[in-house]
Amino acid sequence: MKRRSLLKAAVLGSGAAFAAPAISKGLMEWRMVTSWPKGLPGLGTGAERLAANITAMSGGRLTIKVYAAGELVPALECFGAVANGTAQMGHDAGYYHTGKSEGCAFFTAFPFGFTMGEMAAWIKHGNGQKLWDELYAPFGLRGFQAGSTGTQMFGWFRREIRGLADLQGLKFRTPGNQGRVLQKLGVIPVSLPGGEIFPALQSGAIDGAEWVGPYNDLALGFY
C-alpha cells in the first residue's frame, strides 16, 4: 500500500500581524512552531529553509524563529498554537488536525489520493486553495503548500508481515484517514509524532509504524 504526496503545510494565522510578534524599529520576528525534531533532514530543514526564504523575500524586515517539536508546544499541537496566537506560523501536516475538522485530511496524504503533481495542480488551479481557505477560516487560519515528500512507503514492523492475517490487532503508528483504512483490516491505528516513533517501536508500545520514505526514515533510525 502506498500513500500519495504528503503536502507539508505552513499554517498562517490570518490575524498574525496582531498576535503580538516581536517588533523593533520596523523589524518583526514571528514564531513558527513545527511538528518535527530539531534539524530533521527533509521536514525539519524544510521548515528552516522556508523561514530563511521569507526573511530574504522581506528584505530582512521579517524574521522567523523556528521551534522544533516540543520546544514551544507539543508536536501535534501546532494548529492550536497558531489559532490561539502562541505562534504566528506552523509547519506540519494537515492530517494531524482531523480532530478539528475531517476535511483537513484532504490537504495532506490521503489513501489512494492525488500524486504529488496532481495535488499541486488541484491546490493551485482546481479550487483546492479556495476550499482550504474556507475550511480554515473558522479557526482564523490560512494554509499554504510548503513542500512535498512524494509517494510514501508503507511501514516498519517488529515482526514479518506475510499476509492480511498478520495485521489483526497490530498496533501501527499512522495518522489521518490511512489509519481508518487499516482499521478495516484489523489494525489498531496509533498517532505519534516523528520523534516518538522509534522509541515506541523499541519498547513494544507499538508493533509497526510508517513515516515517509528512505531519506526521511533513515534520519529517524529506520533502516
Give the positions of each predicted feature.
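N-terminal secretory/targeting leader peptides
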Residues: 2-119, 127-223
